[in-house]
């Protein structure tokens, strides 16, 4: 009996349709080698488990109880030099095609149809609270791809693609902020990434909850047509006793995600080509300091996060 599987690697999805339940994990890896060029011994398939443990190569696919078209994430690097291993984003990548949102904010932010969409998300979207909100803490909402993690380059482990100083950044932020992860993918991938990066299991900080693409809304802009955005109003509506415009900041490498709440968004520099930039990227070090400075404030609405570096430099010079 054929067992179709979808494997995600290097920002692309690969369909595997020629294997059956009698084939083994090694057979799957051998087939993936023909698709990706990654040797079986360099492949790590996330989510393939037997009795809670990673499946060995000789385990039959039928024993994994996979549903047809199950999606699996693969980590692994080809045998080329690091420069060759890097997978540059395509020309239409969101980072490259991001646009200046300021002209369209007023038209979109308060439009009734968009506010109604947020109200529906507040009522219908189910949030799994991992750790309860803490009284008196501010809120930090973080994107994943290109913000915390280079999701297009290829590596043997997610840790190699992790933005430098991530755990130090989150440890410091947790002192003053509840931390929420919001990615424009589905929850399965978010959970897999957070586990691979060691974020969901770190003893020095806790994630309050995570949101996926289903919590986003689509808005119409005069110049760009329909786009998906991350409205913080969904969080404020569900947790109004803890969070509001006054105490929330969101980091994302795509500015248009802030379209419904521009005052609360900080556009972070994207972390790309991890193998080349891992030793040079200090963005989270500086943002750790910025978060610590503004945590002293009662109202974030007096800030313009577009000039966060100028604000930090001024405060540190005093």
Curated annotation (Swiss-Prot):
Domain FCP1 homology residues, every copy: 133-294
Gene3D superfamilies xrefs: HAD superfamily/HAD-like, Phosphatidylinositol 3-kinase Catalytic Subunit, Chain A, domain 1
Catalysed transformations (reactions): O-phospho-L-seryl-[protein] + H2O = L-seryl-[protein] + phosphate; O-phospho-L-threonyl-[protein] + H2O = L-threonyl-[protein] + phosphate
Primary residence: nucleus
CDD domains: Ubl_UBLCP1
Example GO BP: regulation of proteasome assembly
InterPro entries in UniProt: FCP1_dom, HAD-like_sf, HAD-SF_hydro_IIID, HAD_sf, Ubiquitin-like_dom, Ubiquitin-like_domsf, UBLCP1
Enzyme Commission designation: 3.1.3.16
Compartments where found: Nucleus
Ubiquitin-like domain segment(s): 3-81
Positions of modified residues (N6-acetyllysine): 117
Keywords, sorted A to Z: Acetylation, Hydrolase, Magnesium, Metal-binding, Nucleus, Protein phosphatase
A GO cellular component entry from the record: nucleoplasm
EC category: hydrolase
Name of this protein: Ubiquitin-like domain-containing CTD phosphatase 1
GO MF term (any one): metal ion binding
Gene name of the encoded protein: Ublcp1
A Pfam family annotated for this UniProt entry: NIF
Named cofactor requirement(s): Mg(2+)
Function: Dephosphorylates 26S nuclear proteasomes, thereby decreasing their proteolytic activity. Recruited to the 19S regulatory particle of the 26S proteasome through its interaction with 19S component PSMD2/RPN1. Once recruited, dephosphorylates 19S component PSMC2/RPT1 which impairs PSMC2 ATPase activity and disrupts 26S proteasome assembly. Has also been reported to stimulate the proteolytic activity of the 26S proteasome.
């Amino acid at each position: 009996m054929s067992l179709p599987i979808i494997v995600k690697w290097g920002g692309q999805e690969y369909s595997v349709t020629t294997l059956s339940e009698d084939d083994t994990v090694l057979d799957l890896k051998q087939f993936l080698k023909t698709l990706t060029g990654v040797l079986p011994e360099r492949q790590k398939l996330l989510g393939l488990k037997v009795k809670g443990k990673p499946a060995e190569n000789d385990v039959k696919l039928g024993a994994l109880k996979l549903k047809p078209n199950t999606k699996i994430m693969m980590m692994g690097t080809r045998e080329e030099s690091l420069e060759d291993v890097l997978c540059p984003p395509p020309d239409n990548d969101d980072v490259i095609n991001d646009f200046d949102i300021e002209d369209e904010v007023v038209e979109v932010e308060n439009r009734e149809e968009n506010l109604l969409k947020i109200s529906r998300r507040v009522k219908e979207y189910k949030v799994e609270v991992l750790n309860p909100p803490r009284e008196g803490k501010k809120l930090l909402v973080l994107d994943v791809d290109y913000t915390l993690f280079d999701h297009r380059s290829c590596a043997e482990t997610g840790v190699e693609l992790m933005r430098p100083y991530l755990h130090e950044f989150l440890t410091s932020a947790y002192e003053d902020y509840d931390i929420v992860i919001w990615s424009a993918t589905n929850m399965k991938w978010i959970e897999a990434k957070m586990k691979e990066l060691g974020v969901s299991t770190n003893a020095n900080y806790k994630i309050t909850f995570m949101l996926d693409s289903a919590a986003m809304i689509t808005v119409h802009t005069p110049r760009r047509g329909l786009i998906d955005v991350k409205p913080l109003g969904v969080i404020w509506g569900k947790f109004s006793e803890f969070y509001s415009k006054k105490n929330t900041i969101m980091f994302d490498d795509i500015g248009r995600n802030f379209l419904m709440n521009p005052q609360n968004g900080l556009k972070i520099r994207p972390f790309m080509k991890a193998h080349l930039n891992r030793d040079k990227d200090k963005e989270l070090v500086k943002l750790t300091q910025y978060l610590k400075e503004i945590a002293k404030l009662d109202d974030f609405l007096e800030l313009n996060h577009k000039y966060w570096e100028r604000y930090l430099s001024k405060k540190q010079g005093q």
